Each structure stands twice: as C-alpha cells, then as structure tokens.
Amino acid sequence: MKNSRFSGFQWAMMVFVFFVITMALSVILRDFQATIGVKRFVFSIKDLAPFIAAIVCILVFKHRKEQLAGLKFSISLKVIERLLLALILPLIILMIGLFSFNTYADSFILLQTSDLSVSLLTILIGHILMAFVVEFGFRSYLQNILETRMNTFFASIVVGLIYSVFTANTTYGVEYAGYHFLYTFMFSMIIGELIRATNGRTIYIATAFHASMTFALVFLFSEETGDLFSMKVIALSTTIVGVSFIIISLIIRAIVYKTTKQSLDEVDPNNYLSHIQDEEPSQEDASSTSNHDVSSKDETKQQDIDNDKHQSKKPNKSDDALTTSNYKEDASSVNKETDTTHNDNIKDHSTYTEDRHSSVVNDVKDEIHEVEDHKADTDKSH
C-alpha cells in the first residue's frame, strides 16, 4: 500500500462518489448516442462517464496532487516492457479464440460487414479515445485511490467488479450477461496486473491493452450481435490468459524473492502477498530485523562517541577545582618565597646596621682614649 494523506472518510467518499456519478452518467449519456451522429462501435459516448466522474472528484475533494498521482506521462524501461505485454496478450487471447472457433464452430462472423462505412483509421482513433477516457477514470484515478488503502491485487478486484457492472449487458439473456461479466472482469484484472509497480505510469499501458482488445473484436467474432458462443469463447479465452498471466507473474516474483532474499515489497511494491508477510514473518524478515538492530547499535555507539567528544569540549568542574587548587598552591609557594627573601633582606639590613653602629662606637671610644692619654701626658709634663 502507498502512504495515504486521505482520511478514511474522504477515501470512502471519493470511491462512492466516483461510482455513483459513473453509473448515473452511463445511463444518461446512453440516450445521446444517436444525437452525436457517431456509431457505437466507433465511439460509445457512455464511456465518457468514468472520465467525467474522475474530473468531478478531483475538483471536489482536496489533495489533488495525490489524486492525480496515477496519471504520469513519463516513460521508463518497465513501462516499455509492459506496453509490449499489453500488445502481445490481446494477440494470444484472439489466437485462442480463433482456434476455438475453428475447432468447435463452422465459421465466425465479421461484425457489421454490411455497415462498415467508416474508415479503419477512424475506428482505430475512436477506440483509442474510448480506451483513454475509460482507463483515465478506472486506472489512473480509481485504482490509484484504492491502492492508498488496500493491496494492489485487491484494488484490481474492486476496480474489476465496478468496471463489470459499468459495462454489464443484459440485453441477450442471463447466460450471455454472465459470460460478459466474466470477460470484462478478467479484462480488468489483466490491466491491473500490467500496471503493477509502474509508479503512476498507467495510462499508456491500460490504453494500449484496452484499445487492442476492443479494436480487434470489432472485426472478429459476433458477440456484439448477441451470439452466445462468441461471447463464451471470448470470455473463456480472456480468463485463461488472465489467470495464467497473474500466476506466472506471481511465480516470477516469488523466485526473485527467494533468490535475492528481498522482501516482496522491494521486489515489487504493492504486491498481493503483503498480508501473508504480516501474519508469517519469514527468515529474511528476521535477518533484516537483526541487521536493523546491528545498525541501531552502531548508531548508538556513534552517538556515545559524539557525546564524549561533546562533553570533552565542555569545561569540567573537577578539573577547574584542581586547577584552582594548583594555582593557589603555586601562589602560596611564591608568597612564601617572597616572604623569605624579604625577611632575609631585613636580616641583612639589620646586621649591616649593627655592624656599622659598633664600628662608630669603637672609633669614638678610641678617640676618647686618645684624648685621655693626651691629657694624662700633658699633666705629667706640668
């Protein structure tokens, strides 16, 4: 399933409104076929109903970009591959039908052999236009909307049922209507498988298959005139090819899944085994889970390393405290050395003062002694 921006209510309303408008317009437009003056086998005006319904829904509901996600006109290798299949599968269906006619019927009837007053080019252009407007509504819009909430396979079933109701033909009896319903349903399922995992590039593939089938049926067989055998052959041929194509596609995807050890979503998005994966996790899922755990552990380790680097850049309080204490010890030691030096200077100064004082006293004493001696000598002489 795709990621959806639609609420559940809006999703349901878009599908419901599309269905109602399509069915109502198919009844209304049918009465205007004679008015436009174009034969029904060239262009059926009723086929405009899904196109108009899609346009109305796009204009009415929000998230228009998401509504138009199924209408991309770019080309990829996968689109070219599916285009080739869209042209080959109708050939296979018609070959099976022709073989059945040659085996079980006397002949087959060319439809309207007496009334083909329109050129082949006009018929081809008309069928391409019919295929485009129908598939724009049912594939590019409706199936795209359905795939936002459900698996591609089941979305194709829903679209197939709505398309079969839209094209139902009860004019020629119940049995004929039953085979016609089977034919249109398998017709739609084949297109649903063809457009799988094309990322919105659906319109080329769906239009090519649709136009190829309807254009060939204009000339071959006689189902349009109510021939039950023709309708039965076409319905069964389409069913055989459709079932075989879906089964082969599933087998190929399963082989790729087993050989590459990928999940089916990686092999092909929106696969119809996704619900089995949810219920029964495989070994590959377990290995992918373990790989995810390992990667998450590596991410955790990397985060721890980054945190350590970040913390290493932050100032550490304990380091600051140690640095401050070291600074204090250095300052105290410097102060002690300064005090010691100052005390030594004071002691040296005091010693120098004492020495100088003692020398002065001694000189005075010597002078006194000399004076006394001189006086004594003077007295003796008198």
From Swiss-Prot:
Read off the InterPro entries from this record: MFS_trans_sf, Rce1/LyrA-like_dom
What residue spans carry the Basic and acidic residues bias annotation?
294-320, 327-382
Q: How does it sit in the membrane?
A: Multi-pass membrane protein
Q: Where is the composition biased (Polar residues)?
A: 284-293
Q: What is this protein called?
A: Lysostaphin resistance protein A
**Domain of life, per lineage:** Bacteria
TM helices/strands, residue ranges: 9-29, 41-61, 83-103, 118-138, 153-173, 175-195, 202-222, 232-252
Where would you find this protein in the cell?
Cell membrane; Secreted, Cell wall; Cell septum
Region called Disordered, residue ranges? 278-382
GO BP terms: namely: CAAX-box protein maturation
In the record, the note on similarity to other proteins reads:
Belongs to the LyrA family.
